[in-house]
């Protein structure tokens, strides 16, 4: 399906971003709580200004299935906490050795590598605690959400993708291997976000599967556009180091700029096709897919 012209997507995304960021500020212990260095580190990366795309995906998926935003908000925060944790770990000297994240120095450059690792672990732990403390969700929904998110993080998800990425560094790999890496390292959390939103709404299995396919294609398209931005983007706009991935295989240096763009377009088309059964109700998710394709940061 195509996004509806009358949708004020900017207003929706901004409202979602504000809702998620406001809730994130409340879920962590206040500054000064012992040990203060830990909580300062957890807050540093988590609360850096961002699009909150994954959190918004939780909210939009829940609302698509007529669920309550308030029920989905803790799950949106949990997904954003996991994402922030993954960024901290990905930026480490032993991983990508990045110096810039969202326009600010990476956490390990501010607090040291050991404290950055502990902050990442703290965020992961806090994400699951937040799900279990979500009073608006039934016990079964909390269990399903915990199981789904832990699977997205683990060896069959984000961690597995990161290991495959590290092993591929400095090697020539084919498109299937590259897609495997990013379907797990990036796509798994997109899928979990959509599914957690559906779980919060009490969605049916067929609805969850449709959202799974939507998010699977969306997540991979997001990574391709990320590679395009890394190749040609301005750090002042993207908030990240430019050219950081030029010593490893990316969609750009494997497929070329035009080939990568065509692949992203095809994935967005597949993502939109997955929404067909929802009709006009899926206008937000359709608009979100178009934003991923056209992103500049």
Tell what function each PLM region has.
Residues 1-28:
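N-terminal amphipathic/basic leader segments beginning at the initiator methionine
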Residues 18, 28-273, 280-293:
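Mg2+-dependent prenyl diphosphate-binding active-site environment of isoprenoid biosynthetic enzymes
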């Amino acid at each position: 399906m195509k996004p509806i012209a009358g949708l004020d997507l900017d207003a929706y995304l901004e409202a979602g971003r504000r809702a998620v960021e406001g809730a994130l500020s409340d879920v962590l212990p206040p500054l000064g709580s012992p040990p203060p260095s830990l909580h300062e580190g957890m807050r540093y990366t988590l609360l850096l200004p961002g699009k909150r795309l994954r959190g918004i995906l939780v909210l939009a998926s829940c609302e698509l299935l007529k669920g309550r935003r308030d029920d989905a908000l803790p799950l949106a925060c949990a997904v954003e906490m996991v994402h922030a944790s993954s960024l901290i770990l990905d930026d480490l000297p032993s991983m990508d050795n990045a110096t810039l994240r969202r326009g600010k120095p990476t956490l390990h450059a501010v607090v040291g590598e050991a404290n950055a690792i502990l902050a990442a672990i703290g965020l992961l732990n806090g994400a699951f605690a937040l799900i279990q403390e979500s009073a608006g969700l039934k016990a079964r929904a909390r269990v399903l959400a915990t199981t789904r998110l832990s699977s997205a993080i683990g060896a069959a998800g984000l961690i597995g993708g990161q290991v495959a990425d590290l092993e591929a560094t400095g090697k020539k790999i084919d498109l299937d291997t590259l897609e495997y890496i990013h379907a797990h390292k990036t796509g798994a959390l997109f899928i979990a976000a959509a599914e957690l939103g559906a779980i919060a709404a009490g969605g049916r299995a067929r609805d969850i599967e449709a959202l799974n396919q939507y998010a699977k294609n969306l997540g991979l398209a997001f990574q391709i556009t990320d590679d395009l931005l890394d190749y040609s983007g301005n750090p002042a706009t993207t908030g990240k180091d430019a050219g950081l991935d030029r010593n490893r295989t990316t969609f750009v240096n494997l497929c070329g700029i035009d080939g990568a763009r065509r692949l992203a377009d095809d994935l967005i088309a597949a993502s939109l096709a997955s929404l067909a059964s929802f009709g006009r109700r899926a206008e937000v998710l359709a608009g979100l897919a178009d934003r991923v394709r056209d992103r500049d940061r």
